[in-house]
């Protein structure tokens, strides 16, 4: 699945990239706005100010299956979760085919979010995003930037193994595995694992799941 961001992008360049992707047989696109630098304003942002605008453009360029981001705890720039869900509706109206969520460490947050989406009339498939923790400082920093809550049991795990990288990696894999098992048990058929370019993390989780995902 190709990832596209639209900060500083122009329509001509994106059309060229999408044409190349079509030529390679790529069908699935994850369309994201991307982070806007603090010193960037106005026309510097490019042709697209919002992810929904990028999604609509991609749909116009070819027969792509387009995914977008969803935020179970709200986007950091949104004033409230309700406002963020309204922004998610714009993505659906723009033709998004599925949503991939920001990381979360408490599945209850996702289940409550799903209820809110359905109540708002949003019923496109939602793929939960799971991030196994492998670095204590990194995960705390990411959570601070994204507004992701750290449940007590997760925080205790990170603090306990913060100075033991291999132990933290094993604990992170175990915690993520537990999240995924619970998601599968509650009807989710797909998850997106944020491995941070560490394929051994994915391998460890799949080894733990074993027969649970064996078709």
Regions found by a protein language model. Name each.
Residues 21, 91, 95, 128, ...:
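Conserved, mostly hydrophobic/aromatic
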Residues 11-19, 79-90, 172-182:
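Short, acidic/polar
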Residues 25-27, 62-66, 96-97, 122-126, ...:
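Short, well-ordered coil/turn segments that N-cap beta-strands
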Residues 3-9, 32-36, 69-75, 104-105, ...:
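Active-site beta-loop-alpha junctions enriched in small/polar residues
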């Amino acid at each position: 699945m190709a990832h596209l961001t639209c900060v500083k992008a122009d329509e001509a360049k994106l059309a060229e990239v999408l044409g190349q992707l079509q030529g390679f047989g790529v069908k699935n696109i994850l369309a994201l706005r991307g982070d806007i630098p603090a010193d960037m304003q106005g026309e510097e942002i490019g042709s697209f100010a919002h992810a929904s605008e990028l999604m609509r453009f991609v749909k116009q360029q070819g027969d792509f299956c387009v995914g977008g981001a969803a935020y179970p705890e709200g986007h950091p720039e949104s004033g409230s979760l309700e406002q963020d869900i309204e922004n998610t509706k714009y993505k659906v109206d723009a033709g998004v085919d599925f949503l991939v969520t920001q990381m979360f460490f408490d599945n209850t947050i996702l289940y409550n979010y799903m209820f809110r989406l359905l109540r708002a009339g949003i019923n496109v498939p939602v793929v939960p995003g799971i991030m196994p923790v492998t670095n204590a400082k990194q995960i705390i920093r990411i959570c601070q930037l994204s507004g992701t809550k750290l449940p007590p049991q997760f925080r205790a795990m990170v603090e306990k193994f913060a100075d033991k990288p291999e132990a933290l990696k094993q604990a992170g894999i175990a915690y993520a595995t537990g999240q995924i098992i619970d998601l599968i048990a509650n009807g989710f058929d797909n998850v997106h694992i944020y491995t941070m370019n560490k394929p051994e993390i994915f391998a460890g989780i799949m080894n733990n799941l074993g027969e649970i995902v064996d078709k």
